[in-house]
Amino acid sequence: MSWRIIQKTPRIANLDEMKSYVKLGVIVLLVACFSFETHAQNIIPKPQNIVKGKGTLASSQLEGIMSNLNGKDIALLKDYIPQSISQELNVKKKRSVHKDSGCFLQLVCTGTPQQAQVAADSVRLQGYHLRISDHGVKIEALTPMGLFYGLQTLRQLEENGKFPYIAITDQPKYPYRGIMIDCSRHFFPIDVLKKQLDAMAYYKFDRFHWHLVDGGGWRLEIKKYPRLTEETAYRTQEDWEKWWNNGDRTFCRKETPGAYGGYYTQDEVRDLLAYAAARHITVIPEIEMPGHSNEVLWAYPELACGGKVHGQSDFCVGKDSTYQFLKDVLMEIMSLFPSSYIHIGGDEAERKTWETCTDCQREMQANGLKTTAELQGHFTEKIEQFLNSHGRRLMGWDEIMEGKLAPNAAVMSWRGFKAGLEAARKGHPVVMTPGEYCYLDMYQDAPMTQPKAQGGFVTLEKTYGYEPLPDSCRTPQTEAFVEGLQGNVWTEYISTPQHLEYMLYPRALALAEIGWTNGPKDYAKFCKRALHAVAFLQQKGYNTFDLVHEIGERKEFVSGINHEALNKRVTYLSKYAPKYRAEGDSTLTNGRGGNWGYIEGRWQGFIDPKGVEVIIDMEKVTDIKDIEINFMQQPASMIYTPASVQIGVSAGGKDYVEIDNTTCDIQPSAGYLIYPYRWKGHAKGRYVHIKALLHEPDSWLFTDEIIINRK
């Protein structure tokens, strides 16, 4: 193998300038068509501009490699070259170092070292131009990162040792394209994470958000505070639901019989960081504060309000010792992780103990704070000042906007998109990751056919349909500050590497394309490429979702329901929860059935002690022949079928005749299901009174449509 230094190379400044090379490629390649029937149609993410020529290049024709890269940059790319072309290249004779003609793989970097250092934050610096002809393969880019992405495209173009004649000009849509894996609820060894980094690099992700600590256990060695891993890296049960919801949330030491868990040594972290860097992936650590910290308070109870521990998850933010602890931890984090962003969580802090804590109240009074939300904002700003003083930036979930948003903070918007847009308009960097599209721990197909998951329903098609910055919200300000998007995998119900991969792929591939490719979307074409990618990943040993046999959306969601109570007025005697209002008072008779998940906007949720109690006005006395009501059960979210369903009818709306009182004997142990209540008989009335009682106090009832006399 010959590594040739090229002294003079053309400069490629940006995507528009690079397009001129595509035009040149059209002439050189004598392109006559724009079909993508073979190699090119399977690329994920789809390149911005592809021009396909006639003919193919066999890898055996390549005589060597030429590059103007030196040192570590070429060493990092070298590992991908055999995977990109063919093993046969290694047996070709060396070429003379003085001869330029021939058939080579050329890797040409046209930028500066300074540009290479900031490439992760620039779409232009991640771009590349790839051309394949009878003269060989030429990849040009401003940075090694761009060359790396060109090689990933080249790898996807190969078929049986051949490459199509083609010209590609490409750069990402967003600079931030991330995946988050929760390693607290369940611990995943370094080798498992490396395997996912391989797939992420192949599909051009460039951020790995590492959720290292949470209520499930502390997973990172901190030398100054060894009790974090000695006492809370292991817990007494593997099953999350039993341990968290039904157990005593007890941690234990590694040597305890039945101990479950693990942690990463600092040397293991350095190893993973080097592995990620070689694939141009920045690793962003997350250290949760001030909430989600019950594992810390188990090991160091003095950091809790009142020094109490069990049942508390918030740090005492009024103690100097809390800030000193967090600064010490963050110093070790910054010594390990070179990322500009340090994620501090900031989500779902309960703040209850702060209301009565002497130290917290003193902190509020001293700083003129009126609410505990403002106290959290004050806490976040102090942590941000510390990070900024060390050249880092704070990132947090969108709850950090409550009270007061720290002046330099970046926001990760997970509760929809409004918070992210608000932050961007105020000049804060934003990463979009709304749960209804980007939470890959939710069901991806009919739940009764799937392993246990979170209660939402996020299909490949739904994820692919997401747009982080739709045209209606696009302004120069939002374009400047929405940095990209991220898919998240929370692992409460994901305990094995196989299950982790099953939830990631292929939905992560949809996010890869959303973050990279401009222009209109075509799900049918993307799905074909995803099917090809699934087969490839399975061949490489990944346990993917079976996209070939996908059931898809619930028929009631797609087709609607026609019945005699359609659009009839509903009077609510119990209140639905505002968060799960669906379509408001019209929900239960609008003919629109819900999908498989309870959060997509058609299932109405009730936690009222009365359960579900409504009256439907049929507008005239009607012969009632059948009544159908579907109730969802999702035990992981405290959603159960009703204890009983009572039906009464009335001609005038005052005196009701009971026509049914059915006890539902579905147990929570049955898992996810949609319970179909059915009544058939003969009754007459204008008003139909329906009452469904809660399975147990503080549980939820969800229903989507009350169907009377289906047509």
Predicted regions and their residues:
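Feature activates predominantly on carbohydrate-active enzymes
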Residues: 120-324, 329-341, 382, 386, ...
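Contiguous, structured surface segment used for ligand recognition
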Residues: 41-174, 499, 515-540
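Flexible, acidic glycine-rich loops studded with aromatic residues
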Residues: 394-399, 404-409, 415-560
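Active-site neighborhood of glycoside hydrolase catalytic domains
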Residues: 305-306, 310-407, 414-421
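Predominantly extracellular/luminal regions of secreted and cell-surface proteins
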Residues: 559-593
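Bacterial Sec-dependent N-terminal signal peptides
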Residues: 1-42
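Aromatic, loop-rich ligand-recognition surfaces of beta-strand-rich domains
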Residues: 596-660, 671-711
